[in-house]
Amino acid sequence: MANVKLFDQTGKEVSSVELNEAIFGIEPNESVVFDVVISQRASLRQGTHAVKNRSAVSGGGRKPWRQKGTGRARQGSIRSPQWRGGGVVFGPTPRSYGYKLPQKVRRLALKSVYSAKVAEDKFVAVENLSFAAPKTAEFASVLSALSIDSKVLVILEEGNEFAALSARNLPNVTVATATTASVLDIVNADKLLVTKEAISTIEGVLA
């Protein structure tokens, strides 16, 4: 079992927390992480690109001139692709770029990125993040007390709405729950700030 320091909201070290080696202490598999990041980035693409082919372009229903006798090349429509203002051949159409990888691969990628953050000492465990009301300034003071001044992913337990609302308006702060934190979120963050309850949930999901 790997141990990490456990802090309270004031930045004081209160104890330590044991992490499951099978989740937070494995050798990171970079190729699997790469595959999952590419998959998740592909799923974020809108895919709303579209062009008009010759059947969608307005006009062009009449043959521009007769078939024979003019000396010019035969033409059937002024919306053929070779005409200015004509349709596009084999242009992009709306589509989804998303694709799914096997669950085993996704789980291994999550374990890999969590393990990498722990190994790099970029995993900050906090006893809890409790707020009486949504207060951005209070959350900012928590980050300051924990010496977090770079891009951070805050991983909360389910239902901690006040903490989520307090953090969401801060620059360089991303909020997720233990079940929704993605490989892409973790890779993009310089540090992870994880509550003790969220750690238990992560271990329960990935064990």
From Swiss-Prot:
Keyword line: Ribonucleoprotein, Ribosomal protein, RNA-binding, rRNA-binding
SUPFAM superfamilies with a match to the protein in the record: Ribosomal protein L4
One GO MF term: rRNA binding
Renumbered residue ranges of the record's region Disordered: 49-78
Entry's transmembrane regions: none
GO cellular component: ribonucleoprotein complex; ribosome
GO biological process, one term: translation
Stated family: Belongs to the universal ribosomal protein uL4 family.
Subunit: Part of the 50S ribosomal subunit.
Primary role: One of the primary rRNA binding proteins, this protein initially binds near the 5'-end of the 23S rRNA. It is important during the early stages of 50S assembly. It makes multiple contacts with different domains of the 23S rRNA in the assembled 50S subunit and ribosome. Forms part of the polypeptide exit tunnel.
Annotated PANTHER family: 50S RIBOSOMAL PROTEIN L4 (PTHR10746), LARGE RIBOSOMAL SUBUNIT PROTEIN UL4M (PTHR10746:SF6)
Name of the protein this chain belongs to: Large ribosomal subunit protein uL4
Organism per entry: Streptococcus agalactiae serotype V (strain ATCC BAA-611 / 2603 V/R)
Lineage: Bacteria, Bacillati, Bacillota, Bacilli, Lactobacillales
